[in-house]
C-alpha cells in the first residue's frame, strides 16, 4: 500500500471516529469535522488511484518502445 493510500485510510478512520464521537456527545462541530475528514480521505484515495493508473499506463507505453 502506498503512503498516499495509507494516509487516506487514516483520514477516513479518524473521520469516522470523530463523527461518531460528535454524534454520541451531541457536538455538531466535531461531527462535521469528522465528515470533512472522511471526505478528505476519500478524495486522497481517489487521487492515489488516479496516480497509480497513470503510472501503470506510463509504464505500459515505456515497455512498448
Swiss-Prot record:
This is UPF0337 protein SAG1136. Belongs to the UPF0337 (CsbD) family. Residues 1-29 are annotated as: Disordered. It comes from Streptococcus agalactiae serotype V (strain ATCC BAA-611 / 2603 V/R). Residues 1-12 have a biased composition (Basic and acidic residues). InterPro entries: CsbD, YjbJ_sf. SUPFAM superfamilies: Hypothetical protein YjbJ. It comes from the Bacteria.
Amino acid at each position: 500500500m502506498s503512503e498516499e493510500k495509507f494516509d487516506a485510510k487514516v483520514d477516513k478512520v479518524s473521520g469516522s471516529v470523530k463523527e461518531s464521537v460528535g454524534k454520541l456527545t451531541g457536538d455538531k462541530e466535531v461531527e462535521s469535522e469528522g465528515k470533512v475528514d472522511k471526505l478528505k480521505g476519500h478524495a486522497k484515495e481517489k487521487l492515489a488511484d488516479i496516480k497509480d493508473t497513470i503510472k501503470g499506463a506510463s509504464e505500459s507505453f515505456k515497455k512498448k518502445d
